[in-house]
From Swiss-Prot:
Catalytic activity: S-ubiquitinyl-[E2 ubiquitin-conjugating enzyme]-L-cysteine + [acceptor protein]-L-lysine = [E2 ubiquitin-conjugating enzyme]-L-cysteine + N(6)-ubiquitinyl-[acceptor protein]-L-lysine
Superkingdom assignment: Eukaryota
Mapped zinc finger ranges (RING-type): 310-345
Organism taxonomic ancestry: Eukaryota, Viridiplantae, Streptophyta, Embryophyta, Tracheophyta
Name used for this protein in its record: Probable BOI-related E3 ubiquitin-protein ligase 2
Description of the deletion phenotype: No visible phenotype. Decreased resistance to B.cinerea and increased cell death upon pathogen infection. Boi, brg1, brg2 and brg3 quadruple mutant shows a higher GA signaling resulting in a higher seed germination in the presence of paclobutrazol, precocious juvenile-to-adult phase transition and early flowering.
């Protein structure tokens, strides 16, 4: 298998036929000879071969190959190279170019020319080793590409470092903003919790005060209940005692009324005897005795009636029992206004209304 070797082309194929674009490095003007000029041409490279001028009629023409780094002295100027004339040279080595020429045809022609001139091939090899360390020529000026590349690399590094710094700064600011927002949220939550705790504490204190007041009220009510219970027991005992006294009084009244009835019967018998005796002439003493008894009975009734009347006003019958002296001595009207017992002058703590109707 045959492997094609790569050949170094110092100029692109497009520059081979563009004779009008070549310029002189000193004057920066197009040369009249095109590629046939011996001077160094512009655009950084020169065609490795030269084309003779079709209008020249002399036998001594320009050498067929001029290297970019070579001069007129590198190639011998003998007439043997142009034995057939310039027209034959153009037909043999330079076919008329088309508007679109393939890269393979250019490479084959260029390789064929290098094989015809070994000295030109050595010049090409020397040029390839020299171009790695020399400055490039572009548009007639020497430009240090490496310095520009280093400057561009420094600019890129500076932009990258600036971008990284800005990214770190933005990241730091975002983190700080996030922390501030978190602190703000925590402070708001803490304030809300503190307010709620304060409200709950105030409510608890208020409920505690209400509970304390209710407990005091319960204690006072229990004491008052105990007082009323004792008073009820006392009143019950007083009522029982008064009931017993009333029963005794009623029994005494019945006894008195029964005695009064017997005395009345006896008086009637005495009256009858007196009538009989008067007729006999001895009834004056009996009449006097009878009158004295009646007067005494009337006085007793008046005394009992007076004792039953109110000791304060004397107009109404006594129906109010005073405690703790237990004297039945006031009427219903005076029982609410008088605070001391009229009989023993002791202070009144309570009073009980007694129904005396039989």
């Amino acid at each position: 298998m045959a492997v094609d070797a790569h050949h170094l082309f110092l100029s692109p194929p497009q520059l081979f036929s563009n004779r009008e674009l070549t310029m002189n490095n000193n004057t920066m003007e197009p040369t009249s000879g095109g590629f046939c000029n011996n001077n160094q041409t512009g655009y950084g490279v020169v065609s490795p071969f030269s084309v003779p001028n079709h209008t020249s009629t002399t036998t001594t023409a320009t050498p067929p190959l001029l290297h970019v780094y070579g001069g007129s002295d590198t190639i011998p100027t003998t007439a043997g190279y142009y034995a057939d004339g310039a027209t034959n040279l153009d037909c043999e080595f330079f076919p008329l170019p088309t508007r679109k020429r393939s890269r393979d045809s250019s490479r084959s022609n260029y390789h064929h020319l290098l094989l015809q001139n070994p000295r030109s091939s050595s010049c090409v090899n020397a040029a390839t080793t020299t171009t790695t360390t020399t400055l490039f020529s572009f548009l007639g000026q020497d430009i240090d590409i490496s310095s520009h590349m280093n400057q561009q690399q420094h600019e890129i590094d500076r932009f990258v470092s600036l971008h990284l710094y800005q990214m770190e700064r933005v990241k730091y600011e975002i983190e700080e903003k996030r922390k501030r927002q978190a602190r703000t949220i925590m402070e708001a939550i803490e304030q809300g919790l503190v307010k709620r705790l304060r409200v709950k504490e105030e409510e608890r204190e208020r409920i505690g005060k209400v509970n304390h007041a209710l407990e005091e009220r319960v204690k006072s009510l229990s004491i008052e209940n105990q007082i009323w219970r004792d008073l009820a027991q006392t009143n019950e005992a007083t009522a029982n005692h008064l009931r017993t006294n009333l029963e005794h009084v009623l029994a005494q009244v019945k006894d008195v009324s029964r005695g009064a009835g017997l005395e009345k019967n006896m008086n009637e018998e005495d009256d009858a005897e007196s009538c009989c005796g008067s007729s006999c002439g001895g009834g004056g003493e009996e009449t006097v005795r009878r009158r004295v008894g009646l007067e005494r009975e009337a006085q007793d009734k008046a005394e009992r009636r007076r004792r039953r009347m109110c000791r304060n006003c004397g107009e109404e019958e006594s129906c109010v029992l005073l405690l703790p002296c237990r004297h039945l001595c006031l009427c219903g009207v005076c029982g609410s206004s008088v605070h001391t017992c009229p009989i023993c002058t002791s202070p009144k703590n309570a009073s009980v209304h007694v129904n005396m109707s039989s």
